[in-house]
């Protein structure tokens, strides 16, 4: 809240009750009375003050929420959208994709895909229903799901596959050869985010581009992923990685490595970062 009563709205990505406690007990006193336009200084102040416990998880989510509020406040004070403060528009429109298509009976899955197709979507992301504990039968069922969606959306549209950390390296290496024929744009989070060597190995296969970063919490974490060529698409969320201040730097870093950024979730803070990158 500014002296004149203008308010900035932030957003906590996960565990909002716990994040609020962290903000109230540790973070808010670091920024109260400060100039919001000193956002770089404020970000560094929060980061260094919580380094022992806050570099990932709740601490960084709290920093993200405050930083998003600061940028929203700056935009309102200057009467400009945040993307203009970041350098302005770089594109006329932001491409979007339909992101649901969870595991369900084949007919229902195809009806849902047809619905998105009729709504005008050209890109689709779907989920799997089975993992390592389900063995070869689970692999077969997963393939049937992908085939069902491809039958509806065709090969002129993009299809992305989301495993949501549900596999391990061994399982991923078994199923990927079965998925190649469906020409997916990417395979998202096949293994847990801590298995960076697994991401490196899968991405180096070159069979299907690997996407990740939804559960990464820092600029330095993405720097590590990019240096190791662990992913072909990065998917940060500004309300997890340190807000607009960190997200803008991650965009620049990804440009250096020529790796596309596809932010996680269609939330306003991610739209502004995408419009300015």
Each predicted region: which residue ranges?
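Metal-dependent enolase-superfamily TIM-barrel catalytic cores that perform enediolate-based chemistry
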Residues: 93-205
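Shared catalytic-loop signature of beta/alpha-barrel
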Residues: 21, 25, 29, 177, ...
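Glycine-rich, aromatic-flanked loop segments that form ligand/cofactor-binding clefts
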Residues: 67-103
